[in-house]
């Protein structure tokens, strides 16, 4: 959030802020940070640095991005460069491969608590992120079982997204409906960002129900 706030007034300042954070603990950052650094560098008039971040992400780390994010205006200075085009082509192919293999994942394997909390991630997140975000709410209570539903649509390397359409929410609705007959005393569903939309659509347009919705 600080990076985005700084970028509103100064791309160079935002770039330096994020770069400092990355250099202080590089292992804590992944594909999205490299992408932000590339965009900030491009928008700050540093095309070589922008290209270097994309090279590191795509060529060195074997990550990939959704095709449309690599057409961002901040990356426009790179659009005619052969290396950028080659990197984008490689990323696009990896994305297509990921889409062809991907499917929705529901972590539930069986009932082992009285109550269930179903976590729904937001865009640029995944099921593991959702579980980690909501785990502190439940604490170490043995009466609650935490599960997550992950979208079938890749957003980037290791992350997924929901579409605001008439189909994407179906995976969430199906997970909710499957849980209704498992004998839980209470079912609570928590969503973040786009996950909130998926939960609301599930309740509005299907027979999926829960005892409480928590929307962030």
Where do the protein language model's features map onto the residues?
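Primarily recognizes the serine-hydrolase "nucleophile elbow" in alpha/beta-hydrolase
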Residues: 185-216
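Serine-hydrolase catalytic machinery in alpha/beta-hydrolase-like enzymes
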Residues: 115-182
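A domain-start/cap signature at the N-terminus of enzymes
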Residues: 59, 63-116, 197
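Structural register within alpha-helical repeat arrays
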Residues: 1-2, 37
């Amino acid at each position: 959030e600080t990076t985005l706030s700084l970028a509103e007034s100064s791309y160079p300042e935002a770039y330096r802020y994020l770069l400092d954070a990355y250099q202080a603990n590089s292992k804590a950052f992944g594909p999205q940070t490299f992408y932000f650094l590339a965009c900030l560098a491009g928008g700050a008039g540093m095309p070589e640095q922008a290209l270097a971040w994309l090279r590191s992400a795509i060529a060195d780390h074997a990550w990939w991005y959704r095709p449309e994010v690599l057409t961002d205006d901040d990356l426009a200075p790179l659009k005619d460069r052969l290396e950028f085009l080659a990197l984008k082509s490689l990323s696009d192919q990896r994305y297509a491969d990921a889409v062809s293999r991907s499917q929705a994942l529901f972590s539930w394997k069986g009932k082992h608590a009285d109550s269930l909390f179903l976590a729904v991630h937001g865009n640029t997140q995944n099921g593991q992120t959702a579980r980690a975000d909501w785990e502190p709410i439940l604490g170490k209570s043995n009466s609650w079982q935490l599960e997550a539903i992950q979208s079938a649509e890749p957003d980037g390397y290791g992350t997924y997204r929901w579409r605001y359409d008439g189909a994407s929410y179906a995976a969430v609705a199906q997970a909710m409906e499957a849980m209704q007959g498992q004998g839980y005393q209470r079912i609570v569903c928590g969503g973040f960002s786009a996950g909130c939309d998926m939960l609301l659509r599930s309740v509005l347009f299907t027979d999926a129900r829960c005892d409480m919705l928590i929307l962030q």
